[in-house]
Amino acid sequence: MKLMWLLFLCVLAFSIAQIYINDTCAGGVHRCYEPCEKKKCRLPHKCINGRCTCYVGRNVCAISSH
């Protein structure tokens, strides 16, 4: 029973990821071709937990307006 609660809490923690559309991604993003520090993710990419969602062969980072 304790294992089931632990598994439930782990799934819950992963499912509460903060998703922001076209938000700044600071904090050492290494999944993009160029880091998205002080830049924004281009649409339709999203910023999930400080990282832009990235696809192979696409530049997802844009210069931030602030």
UniProtKB/Swiss-Prot annotation:
Keyword Disulfide bond: yes
Keyword tRNA processing attached: no
Gene3D superfamilies (UniProt xref): Knottin, scorpion toxin-like (3.30.30.10)
Record keywords, A-Z: Disulfide bond, Secreted, Signal
Annotated localization: Secreted
Membrane-spanning segments: none
Modification comment: Contains 4 disulfide bonds.
Recorded coiled-coil stretches: none
Any one Gene Ontology cellular component term annotated for this protein: extracellular region
Tree of life domain: Eukaryota
Tissue: Expressed by the venom gland.
Signal peptide start-end: 1-17
Domain comment, as recorded: Has the structural arrangement of an alpha-helix connected to antiparallel beta-sheets by disulfide bonds (CS-alpha/beta).
Family statement drawn from the similarity comment of this UniProt entry: Belongs to the short scorpion toxin superfamily. Potassium channel inhibitor family. Alpha-KTx 27 subfamily.
Protein name stated in the entry: Potassium channel toxin alpha-KTx 27.2
Gene source species: Lychas mucronatus (Chinese swimming scorpion)
